């Protein structure tokens, strides 16, 4: 058994109780759904409702969109999820991997090309 009071979880008694009760009350379908992190190709409320309520996803990998749209999707999904979701995005080049208006920074090869290991 994993000690969720220890690092990296560091849960208090109330947090441990929530985890145990939540797991106990989940259906098999909900537990399987927690393993799924689909790619979010759409901000359409119908699509979001479908992946959240029909598949019980454990998270979502966002594709690039405007930051306001991404924030709205994120808020909607978190508000309608029984369990907090993992959020994933392609961030290896900065915030522009989730939001088209996010900050971009050099990729690994660009940084290496500077010849400056402090970059």
Which residues does each predicted region cover?
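Enzymes and membrane/adaptor proteins characterized by extended Gly/Ser/Thr/Asp/Glu-rich
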Residues: 41-119
């Amino acid at each position: 058994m994993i000690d969720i009071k220890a690092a990296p979880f560091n849960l208090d008694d109330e947090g441990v109780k929530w985890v145990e009760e939540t797991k106990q009350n989940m259906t098999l379908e909900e537990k399987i759904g927690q393993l799924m992190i689909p790619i979010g190709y759409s901000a359409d409320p119908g699509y979001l409702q479908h992946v959240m309520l029909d598949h019980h996803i454990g998270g979502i990998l966002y594709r690039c969109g405007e930051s306001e749209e991404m924030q709205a999707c994120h808020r909607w999904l978190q508000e309608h999820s029984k369990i907090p979701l993992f959020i994933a995005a392609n961030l290896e080049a900065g915030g522009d991997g989730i939001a088209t208006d996010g900050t971009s920074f050099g990729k690994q090869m660009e940084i290496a090309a500077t010849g400056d290991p402090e970059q």
